[in-house]
Amino acid sequence: MNTPKNYKVGYKLFEMREDGKLFPLFISKGKETPMNEWLPAENNPTKGYAARPGWHISMTTPDAPHLRGYDGSDLGPYKSRFKNGKRVWCEVLYNTTIDYRDEVSKLPKKCFTDKSPTNGWYLFNEGNRSTWAISDAIKVTRILTEEERQDILRQMNYDEVSAFGPYKKAFEKRKKIA
């Protein structure tokens, strides 16, 4: 795939095997995501997940409080599929050549459900959770160290504890019900 005309920097959480290979967390989780090459999105409907084809990217912060574990860690409620595997934040480039925000804002679900954006991107807001970019192509440029991730969050005055607060309350409420 050729380099898009326009692109931006974002962040994406991956699962990394002990050998350093990256894999998506949920959709197409068995397919390796190589670094330093432009990768087109695929439409792979997956049971239990809403149909929103495309690469999902955090635009500004390497944090996703809705994917954290009950204790607030990046481990989430899932154990690694891989022996000695772990979740890692990566810096990515994502295609922004064509902006589909106006088009998807008129759709019933405010997103494409049958295709990824063609040569572009749009924003998706999932209620009170978060807003992320959905693009037809990404390029993973580097794996962030935890120190680099924390530096980015500090520069943005981003408070992980506050961001996780609503999710922590929801987790605690669910634990009381269970």
Task: Describe the function of each predicted region.
Residues 1-34, 48-52, 64-178:
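Conserved NAD+-utilizing ADP-ribose enzyme module
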Residues 56:
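Histidine-centered active-site/metal-ligand motif
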